[in-house]
Amino acid sequence: MDSNGRFHSDWCSMIYSRLMVARTLLTEDGAIFISIDDREVENLIKIGNEVFGESCFVGNISWQKTYSPRNDSKGIPAEKESIIVYGKNLEWMPKKLPRTAEMDAKYKNPDNDKMAWTSDNPCAPGARTHQGMVYAIQHPFTGEMLYPATSSCWRYDQSTMFDYMSGWCEYELKDIGDNVERAKICGIDASEVRKDVKAIVLKKSLEESKKNAEYVLKRGQWPRFYFTKNGKGGIRRKTYLENVDGRMVTNLWPFAEVGHTDEAKKELKALFNGEIPFDTPKPVRLMQRIVQIASEKDELVLDFFSGAATTAHAVMLQNTIDNGNRHFIMVQIPEKLDGKYANLCEVGKERIRRAGKKIKEESPLT
């Protein structure tokens, strides 16, 4: 039946009407996440583009829903499911995720600085449009003139860079007649390059400058821009852990981070004393991530296809984690079930009661 034209037409009409209502209910800074399999994902995006506007399309997330593909599957076994995301307005962006211990472990403190840091690129793109940030910096250990990479400029304006470099030894600004070199970096003719940009050069002799720089190197707490290979290498920039935000949300969500279908069934089984009253639940971690990146602590979360109320479970759990006060509305057709519960709505209501009780008992906030 799923493959006939009438079913497909009815599905499209149902989704279209639901999305129209959803768009009306969304706040201006809201977003919608729609889970769909491969068969209808293309049609869903077409409908979503019509309802929300193509410019409000945020992404197509691939959720790795299984850790063990079925051997008896016909064709290519499906390991992932799509989650289509639209914002109410084109400026909507997901919140960043908390950093992991593995990410933070990359930050070290070899020079006994005020905080841990990692080595980063001293340059930024945009040489042609930022010609005032393309100039030479003289190496305090070797005397070599250092320039940004091709098509790049230094990360900060010259005044800021001058202050950072002065942490190694005394510097001064000087015209060294390097317009040709600077023009090459900018990708323009020498006649077009900005002419009033001076180099940051050593104020004293290389011998004196090197002596001072070696003292700073041994002392520790190096300036923000430092030199690799014990002073003999190139220039790099410190990025401090304290100044780094969370990690960006990507369109690949592996089961190791957000759970899989077997995990979802085990969660239901644990709540319902060994029973699994619904065959296709979503894992709590999956819905919790959506709540985490798409809502503020005091917002309302609506699920149009709530199923076994995993979203409600996730909202309650996230509230305990970040001390939030989110509320939820679960919408579900009372689909009849075989077994203890008459319909799917009863399963959802019972899950909310049981999950809420469990979370309250285990929460450090209560």
Descriptions of predicted regions:
Residues N4, H8-C12, R39-N43, T280-K360:
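Conserved S-adenosyl-L-methionine
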